[in-house]
């Protein structure tokens, strides 16, 4: 299953400038927030979570909240995702991969999910 999302970095920057950490707290854990360097990172994380929920075919919903999708980085600073135990079981997920890029004022993410 594959999901994709694109977001204007300026849109995320505008929301962040108005709401600061209140905005971040709506979709990122404190651990995920620790990775943030700038608003482009926030936009990339938004796109990752949206793409992951689309790959599941449900979007952000009761079946999969923002906090059921967990972003972490490896020692080379590359992003990875995993899902909550609830989502892993409900959707029979074996593994997930993510790619994120920034260009021309946009952040785009693609998530591929392999089922058992």
Swiss-Prot record:
Signal recorded as keyword: no
Cofactor (UniProt): Mg(2+)
A GO BP entry: fatty acid biosynthetic process
Claim: Protein biosynthesis is one of the keywords in the record: no
One CC-aspect GO term: cytoplasm
This protein's UniProt keywords: Cytoplasm, Fatty acid biosynthesis, Fatty acid metabolism, Lipid biosynthesis, Lipid metabolism, Magnesium, Metal-binding, Transferase
InterPro entries (UniProt xref): 4-PPantetheinyl_Trfase_dom, 4-PPantetheinyl_Trfase_dom_sf, ACPS, Ppantetheine-prot_Trfase_dom
Alphabetized GO MF terms: holo-[acyl-carrier-protein] synthase activity; magnesium ion binding
Subcellular location field: Cytoplasm
Similarity-based family: Belongs to the P-Pant transferase superfamily. AcpS family.
Function according to Swiss-Prot or TrEMBL: Transfers the 4'-phosphopantetheine moiety from coenzyme A to a Ser of acyl-carrier-protein.
Protein name (Swiss-Prot/TrEMBL): Holo-[acyl-carrier-protein] synthase
